[in-house]
Amino acid sequence: MTSVQQPKPEYPGKLLQAAAIAKPFQQSIEEEIGVRKEKHLPVPKLVGILAKPSPPSIAYAEWTAKACQAVGINFEIWKTWDDSTVVNEAEKNEAESLQNFDLEADVEDLILAANRDKSVDGIMVYYPIFGGRQDTYLQQIVDPRKDVEGLHFFYCWNMYHNVRWIKPSQLGCAPGTTNEAELVGLDSNVVDEENVPEGFCKSILPCTPLAVVKCLESVGVYDSKLPYGDRLHGKTITVINRSEVVGRPLAALLSNDGARVFSVDIDSIVEFTKRKDNEEQNAPTSGYKKSSKVIQAHNDNSSARLRPSHIVQACPYKDSESCVRASDVVIGGVPSASFKVPTAWIKQDAICINFSSEKNFES
């Protein structure tokens, strides 16, 4: 087991609230919208689509409304039900429990209406609705030009393959046809989030994983002296959650930025790390030798990217304790009140982030 220095009582941890980290971003948005108003330009409009009268979804929608109002974004909630039919908590619970055979079609109609509405700039759908393939289907019919959550397959593919910049004309194109080939000759220290070349824009990332990245940037985990795209080099991070919504995308984002990431789930632990060079990448990782066609495809695809994407491999550690003890950053996302990361596992000066609705760390 890795030997690390344990936290000492004379060096208590420091608690940082996400609200303080978010404030500069909120101010920036508010200022930009203020400029648009001065120029008599339209204010961005976001539509939130609610499928069911479930308390968590309604609470999230109401929070979205307050957040938008605070910075000057126009926000509307589109519901599938008429409020006059749900007047109290008992009826709300009964309505939620009934099987609505029209629900998928109703949600789809609202999404299509928002897609067509030229006054709508962004669309947000409150999931889960059905779970599984039905929700995935609904995510794919949202116009990618209006998808503020980055759930469309186009954005998912870009995120996992480390494609950071796109041309608006590429939106909706098939995977493998959207690349950064025109940027390959540019210095990676010049092409970054603040210096996007003309004609390109940032690909949309899912909100919670991106929020975790912003938290890590704010506390100095990212090293700005290193080249953009490799500023987590030398850092070891444990992410305790591998959901398709947050945990897996987060592990991919962090490893694409150079970190060694231990991804811990309920029944397995895997390691996300930066993709190796072509020679190592083409080496067999199973009992089969890669075909010449696969090797050629790897080489062709690599040449079309500005930087490599991550790979997933077996983790050298077989238990979460060993992963946490070896980590500079520990990120908890377990939706269980009984799950706690023991303080004794966390090494001195490690950063801990909790994105679960429950407290995942001992206090």
Set out the residue ranges of the language-model regions.
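ADP-ribose/adenylate-binding Rossmann-like module
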Residues: 150, 332-334, 338, 344-363
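Short beta-strand elements in bilobed, periplasmic/extracellular small-molecule ligand-binding domains
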Residues: 65-98, 261-265, 270
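Structural alpha-helical scaffold elements that stabilize or flank donor/cofactor-binding regions
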Residues: 116, 322-324, 345
